[in-house]
Amino acid sequence: MLEAYIRERRRQKEILLMTHIVMGYPDFETSMAIVEQMVEAGVDLMELQIPFSEPMADGPVILGANQAALSGGARVERCFEFARQAAAKFDIPFLFMTYYNILFKYGVTPFVNKMADINIKGAIVPDLPPEEGQAYLKAMEEQNLSPIHIFSPRTSNERMDFLASQTRGFVYCVARKGVTGKETRFTEEIAGYLDRCRQATTLPLAVGFGVKDEADIAFLKGKADIAVVGSEMIRVVENQGVEGVGRFIQSLA
């Protein structure tokens, strides 16, 4: 179980690190090299994003990577094969991140069954609220996979309680309202929000949207269980190449 893995790792580390890649960006061979660099540098778990043409939760950096991957031929079946290879090769949990249109076109239950077949441990689908995702949640439960839902600073306490009840593995707490990759100021206001998140659930908390350096991660220690680095990883690849990935991850410790 994903939650059990996270709790075991947390006994060894003050905070875990989850990274994010867009499969097929800049191409599949390079994507696998990036995954390898991340794992060797000590990443604890990883989101594999299936590219989509209109990723509503993502800012310009990840949007651009989605569009480039699609232009390069990153289709769902190819992403499944990539994910299968990654999960077989590396001994960390991999999750899918994508949008409901991808599941709808593939078929929700076949999509979830495929996840189980290739050893993907859970999924983040930002545009699928639990009220509209009963078939998805049922399929995930049947396969013992983790549907991960999202809290934001604007989520009411009552809504947090409900979302947490429909979540397995961990809750993804976005550090601010908006899209990925923008500047986030990690302040006492965010600390108060994370305290609300902690009161809403006993599940581990992951925090993303704007996490980019050692200072951000230091701020999150004691407040969250997992720091999520997404857009900044793409910037590193674009500016420093694959060889910069491991150095960057080690700089976050």
Curated annotation (Swiss-Prot):
Record-annotated active site: 47, 58
Pathway assignment: Amino-acid biosynthesis; L-tryptophan biosynthesis; L-tryptophan from chorismate: step 5/5
CDD domains per UniProt: Tryptophan_synthase_alpha
Pfam families linked: Trp_syntA (PF00290)
EC annotation from Swiss-Prot or TrEMBL: 4.2.1.20
Record field: catalytic activity: (1S,2R)-1-C-(indol-3-yl)glycerol 3-phosphate + L-serine = D-glyceraldehyde 3-phosphate + L-tryptophan + H2O
Key words of the record: Amino-acid biosynthesis, Aromatic amino acid biosynthesis, Lyase, Tryptophan biosynthesis
Cellular component aspect of the GO annotation: cytosol
Top-level EC class: lyase
Cited PROSITE patterns: TRP_SYNTHASE_ALPHA
Alphabetized InterPro entries for the sequence: Aldolase_TIM (IPR013785), RibuloseP-bd_barrel (IPR011060), Trp_synthase_alpha_AS (IPR018204), Trp_synthase_suA (IPR002028)
A GO molecular function held by the record: tryptophan synthase activity
Subunit structure of this chain's protein: Tetramer of two alpha and two beta chains.
PANTHER family per record: TRYPTOPHAN SYNTHASE ALPHA CHAIN, CHLOROPLASTIC (PTHR43406:SF1), TRYPTOPHAN SYNTHASE, ALPHA CHAIN (PTHR43406)
Family that this chain belongs to: Belongs to the TrpA family.
Role: The alpha subunit is responsible for the aldol cleavage of indoleglycerol phosphate to indole and glyceraldehyde 3-phosphate.
Name this protein carries in UniProt: Tryptophan synthase alpha chain
